[in-house]
Regions:
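Residue-level signal for short hydrophobic patches within transmembrane helices
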Residues: 11, 15-34, 38, 61-68, ...
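Transmembrane helical elements of multi-pass membrane transporters/channels
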Residues: 20-39, 141, 152, 175, ...
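Small-residue-rich hydrophobic transmembrane alpha-helices
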Residues: 52-112, 149-168, 276-339, 372-386, ...
Length: 456
């Protein structure tokens, strides 16, 4: 294993280890966001507002697909991180072999569902008729190549599961640059239209997947299975599938709620769609440090769970919460003042109505970011502890809450209801996850050990 890029999450001071592990994840997330932001900036600037709205109208579907792929990859990585914490290297190879087989099967199923269901779904979401063809062109490209997203997220999840969050960063930076170059070339030189933005994203993710594979082959060979490792192990397959689907479905359930909410956004017309698209992209960037810390908690807790260190789990949980809360408080203040300028820049527009609504979205939702930070920390911690059902409960709370808002509240309050929907649900979900986590026996044991100065 490449020790230089691998962070030891089981031994030594926790804060430096968490920061060292989370920083490459943060930078990776930044460049991951650049995939979509490059699409938005280039599409809006060179193809016009209708094309921008066409991409924006598919945001929830895009998040549904990519979120599922990311969740499955990270979920299976949780199992491998637990095995790595226990230093069970033979079982790790079997687990990796199983993730490859399951990844192929899930990719085919998602592609088939997308092939038959995409156009009716866009119609159900009340996508405006003038942008419907472009929306379908863009998102159908993403869905037809979903296997590429699965491959990259599986490989990146493997690297993170053993504490190597740095390696995937270099590959992702390279592919993000390629994505921007291809966007510009396809749209401005070949004039291929909005579909080419999706093609550029797929090619870029494919490069990341290929580079990750060759890095693992050279530097982390213990992650590569042998032919004899491709064997049926019911308990292992069930564990991987349950954890992978739990995290994949969690992201998908959240995204289904977003798809439902998107139908309300689409009903307000192309200008509001563009405002929402720009505001959501800014929000995603503002929350990147928080999401990096919460993502690192999954691996940290899973490895220490395998190593039987409840004291480190509780200590790490506290430190992660403090860091995340501090950042989101800063982001709230920053967005209050900078929102109008940021929305105008990202939407490539001086339309006062668009800027006003995009800025309003950011100013209201950012007040609730500290609660969102705790929500993600608690949920990822439960996943790291191997809990499958409790994190899903929070996702169902969000789904049903969005259905209630779309059916009864937004028709009465208008776009303000769209803005308030998610923040109010964050409060409920955070409370549910806090009580679920605090009752976990490992958290109770870790608190006792820290209170008495003991060590597991």
């Amino acid at each position: 294993m490449n020790k230089k890029s691998t962070v030891d999450l089981i031994h030594g001071p926790i804060l430096p280890a968490l920061i060292s592990f989370a920083l490459p994840i943060l930078l990776s997330n930044i460049f991951q966001q650049l995939y979509n932001t490059a699409d938005i900036l280039i599409v809006g600037r060179f193809l016009g507002q209708d094309s921008l709205a066409a991409v924006g109208a598919t945001t929830a579907i895009f998040d549904l697909i990519i979120g599922f792929a990311l969740g499955v990859g990270n979920g299976m990585g949780v199992v491998i991180a637990r095995l790595y914490g226990a230093r069970n290297f033979e079982k790790i190879k079997e687990a990796v072999a199983a993730t490859w087989i399951l990844g192929i099967i899930l990719s085919v199923l998602v592609m088939l569902m997308g092939f038959f269901g995409l156009y009716p779904l866009l119609q159900y979401l009340e996508t405006p008729a003038e942008i419907l063809p472009q929306s379908y062109e863009y998102i159908s490209m993403i869905v037809s190549c979903v296997g590429v997203s699965f491959a990259y997220n599986l490989f990146a999840g493997l690297l993170r599961s053993v504490g190597d969050s740095l390696a995937a960063l270099g590959f992702l930076i390279f592919s993000a640059i390629v994505n921007v170059i291809l966007d510009l070339y396809f749209i401005t030189q070949l004039q291929l239209g909005v579909q080419s933005a999706g093609l550029a994203t797929i090619i870029s993710q494919g490069l990341s997947a290929i580079l990750c594979y060759f890095y693992i082959r050279k530097s982390v060979p213990e992650l590569l299975p042998r032919l004899k490792d491709f064997k049926w192990n019911k308990a292992l397959y069930v564990d991987l599938l349950e954890q992978g689907l739990a995290m994949g479905l969690m992201g998908s359930i959240v995204s289904v709620g977003s798809v439902i909410l998107q139908s309300s956004v689409n009903s307000f017309g192309a200008v509001i769609i563009s405002a929402q698209t720009a505001a959501r992209r800014i929000m995603a960037f503002a929350l990147l440090p928080m999401t990096a810390i919460s993502a690192s908690m999954t691996t940290f807790i899973s490895q220490n769970f395998g190593a039987k260190r409840p004291d480190r789990i509780v200590h790490g949980l506290r430190l992660g919460s403090y860091i995340s809360m501090a950042w989101t408080s800063f982001a709230c203040v920053f967005l209050f003042f900078a929102s109008p300028s940021l929305v105008s820049f990202l939407a490539s527009s001086t339309d006062g109505y668009l800027i006003e609504n995009g800025a309003l979205y950011l100013r209201i939702s950012s007040v609730f970011y500290p609660f969102l930070s705790l929500l993600l920390i608690y949920r990822n911690s439960l996943q790291g502890l191997g809990q499958k059902l409790l994190p899903l409960v929070s996702s169902f709370i969000e789904l049903f809450g969005k259905i209630i808002f779309v059916a009864w509240i937004i028709p009465w309050t208008g776009y303000t209801g769209v803005i308030l929907c998610e923040p109010l649900l964050w409060l409920v979900m955070t409370a549910q996850l806090y009580f679920s986590l605090s009752k976990h026996p490992w958290i109770k044991e870790g608190k006792k050990l820290l209170a008495t100065g003991g060590k597991s």
